[in-house]
Amino acid sequence: SMGMERAKSLLCVRSGLSFLDIIARQVLHLRERYDAPLPLIFMNSFRTSADTMDALARYEALPIAGLPLEFLQSKEPKLLTKDLTPVSWPRDPDLEWCPPGHGDIYPAMVGSGLLDRLAEAGFERVFVSNSDNLGAVPDARVAGWFATSGAPFAIEAVPRTASDKKGGHFARRKADGRIVLRETAQTPAHDQAALADMTRHRYASTNNIWFDITAMRETLAARRGVLGLPLIRNVKNVDPADRKSPEVIQIETAIGAAIEVFEGARTIEVGRDRFVPVKTTNDLLILRSDVYQLGKDFVMDQVSEDLPYVELDADFYKFVVEFDKRFPDGAPSLRKATSFKVDGDWTFGHGVKVVGDVELDSETTAQRIPEGTVLSDG
């Protein structure tokens, strides 16, 4: 969605550190704090593996003896929307393929032998999070809750906000009472209004997942290595950075959908500080701004009371390359912002501050906000 040619985790967050750098340093800090051999293992795709491993090479202490630093997702062909045949894209054949969503983690852990290796090494539980969520730090309090809960599977949940209206939500299935996770792409058009109703569906998934290794191994073995998660049909361009390239379908599954598979699965409400996802350049702008500070423990601490609502014009800011061109001196100050909406083509100088509710609107030529400008609703 951001036109990335490499792994999103390689994007710079601040002080020259990428998502990967911060995650690696978080884990190294926790190992020292708890004197525990906490493994860090990445699920990479065929597209992200080489770049990820190159970026991690500087952290020589990161690997744990007997365990890999990565395992690979499967890959599948992208299908043309017009006839459902595999797409051909000679200018970059790699773009003919895609990973089948993060729900592939379960069969990938089995196929790679990782699940067995973790069990043989004496590990009992696994915590999984998205690499673009720097709030998902391994937390001893949540780990303790999960260990004593007896649940085979759990997801951290947060109260939904305006930013989560288009995201998935939890519900309870009437047929058997089990918790299910419904994603936007799985919701029919006539039910979209109900999906966005935050009084009806109050909680969103963080994609911070906990599971018991024994329960996962037994369930996968009973199901012949496949959990049977609901399929998600995503329509995209074969080249994410070229909106004129052919439309394709990518069939995916969601990692959190596994909650419906396990009897006794649970959700646990956590603070918003454990959910700092970067799905769009709107999110990236907030993360790079002074709304957050990077602590000595390498945790991104929110220093403003509330997160501002940011909406950048997709015609000019959707892709990271174009986004960076328009913020050449870094993100503006958003600590005192309530909302920040940008329509049109604007470039921002150094030291710009946004205060209150600000909306920029330009239907003409590109414009520039000079350095040191204070944008306010006053």
PLM feature spans:
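Domain-scale recognition of functional cores that engage charged ligands
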Residues: 4-256
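Catalytic nucleophile-elbow at a beta strand-turn-alpha helix junction centered on a G-D-S/GDSL motif
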Residues: 1
